Amino acid sequence: MTNAFFLTGTDTEVGKTVASRAILHAAASANIKMAGYKPVASDSTPTDEGMRNSDALYIQDASVVELDYQEVNPYAFEAAISPHLAAEQEGQVIDFDVLSAGLEHLKSKSEAVLIEGAGGWRVPISHTDFLSSWVKREKLPVILVVGVKLGCLSHAILTAEAIKNDGLELVGWVANRINPGTENYADIIKMLEKNLPGKKMGEIPYMPALKNVTYQSILI
């Protein structure tokens, strides 16, 4: 049975794609046939081949399995806003069945699937549903990316509690140092280790350029 994991963040812009790329590189190093999946993405760019999202392109490039863009990212919206508003602007509806069909397709081509979410855990994909509702439907184990900065402890602990309240397991978490000037970094990590369930999968040092990320950059 193919393993699938959902990767979320404590907020938007906390390094989900950095962590996804590192995990995919680690899988490649371990000879694990892992596919990356970014089912919903805003802030995409129109091209001759259709909408393209930079995060989804990074995930496509890092996947061990060779994938077409549409296999990686079925919903790509142009506006850099919440997916539910971006979809509404473009007259689209984000369908859970489409997300599930895409996941099952990737499972058939791989040994494991890493699914990167959009925004944080409770990001809305319509006026009535959240992306986390789909994760709950699929009963997926969750990996949390913590953007280490002032205030992240509360964000991380509240997110972990929400995941647990949804009946899902937080199997691991990654600390990403998004601000090189963050004071008391070591103390923050200790508090995360004490208060978050699941395994600390690694710490990502501050990296201004995503292209420099390889599996060696994260302690998996």
From Swiss-Prot:
The protein's required cofactors: Mg(2+)
Keyword Ligase belongs to the record: yes
One MF annotation (Gene Ontology) recorded for this entry: dethiobiotin synthase activity
Binding site for Mg(2+): T17, D55, E116
Catalytic activities: (7R,8S)-7,8-diammoniononanoate + CO2 + ATP = (4R,5S)-dethiobiotin + ADP + phosphate + 3 H(+)
Metabolic or biological pathway, per its Swiss-Prot or TrEMBL entry: Cofactor biosynthesis; biotin biosynthesis; biotin from 7,8-diaminononanoate: step 1/2
Keyword Cell membrane: no
Amino-acid positions noted as binding ATP in the UniProt annotation, renumbered to this chain: E13, V14, G15, K16, T17, V18, D55, E116, G117, A118, G119, N176, R177, N212
SUPFAM superfamilies according to UniProt: P-loop containing nucleoside triphosphate hydrolases
GO biological process: biotin biosynthetic process
Function, in words: Catalyzes a mechanistically unusual reaction, the ATP-dependent insertion of CO2 between the N7 and N8 nitrogen atoms of 7,8-diaminopelargonic acid (DAPA, also called 7,8-diammoniononanoate) to form a ureido ring.
Family membership noted in the UniProt record: Belongs to the dethiobiotin synthetase family.
Record protein name field: ATP-dependent dethiobiotin synthetase BioD
Organism of origin: Photobacterium profundum (strain SS9)
Lineage, top ranks: Bacteria, Pseudomonadati, Pseudomonadota, Gammaproteobacteria, Vibrionales
